[in-house]
Amino acid sequence: MSRRGTAEEKTAKSDPIYRNRLVNMLVNRILKHGKKSLAYQIIYRAVKKIQQKTETNPLSVLRQAIRGVTPNIAVKARRVGGSTHQVPIEIGSTQGKALAIRWLLGASRKRPGRNMAFKLSSELVDAAKGSGDAIRKKEETHRMAEANRAFAHFR
């Protein structure tokens, strides 16, 4: 039996302006080289641009985008008898949100455009509407899981 105590699960903190955990998760994923103030600037500019584009609550657009991109199921490589199978596994809500944020940021980095705030706002608006690169990534993941459904018993 382990002598070490079980680690407490950390709860996500909320950002100073919107008091929203999703915004803080987004900030922590966009962060590079420890420059958190720059990450906050990028996010807040993107939120302002969403407000101008859609003329609705930008946080609801953000929530809708993340909800649309969050996958329910993914595939995991599993080695069975010398061959590697892609085994479909269910994803929890926290891990799903983390994946969705990662995909949204990856898709917005690939976008052509002036700056990161502009690209991120465009990607979030597209994802909320049900289009964009991040949505395509989710659909591709679900297709992979559906195609490899026969290996679900290897879990």
Swiss-Prot record:
Function: One of the primary rRNA binding proteins, it binds directly to 16S rRNA where it nucleates assembly of the head domain of the 30S subunit.
Subcellular location: Plastid, Chloroplast
Gene3D superfamilies reported in the protein's UniProt record: Ribosomal protein S7 domain
One GO CC term, this protein: small ribosomal subunit
Classification of source organism: Eukaryota, Viridiplantae, Streptophyta, Embryophyta, Tracheophyta
InterPro entries according to UniProt: Ribosomal_uS7, Ribosomal_uS7_bac/org-type, Ribosomal_uS7_CS, Ribosomal_uS7_dom, Ribosomal_uS7_dom_sf
Primary location class: plastid
An example molecular function term from Gene Ontology annotations: structural constituent of ribosome
Tagged with keyword Chloroplast: yes
Family as reported in the entry's similarity comment: Belongs to the universal ribosomal protein uS7 family.
Oligomer and partners: Part of the 30S ribosomal subunit.
Annotated organism of origin: Cabomba caroliniana
Any one Gene Ontology BP term: translation
Kinase is among the record's keywords: no
Keyword entries, A-Z: Chloroplast, Plastid, Ribonucleoprotein, Ribosomal protein, RNA-binding, rRNA-binding
Name of the protein in question: Small ribosomal subunit protein uS7c
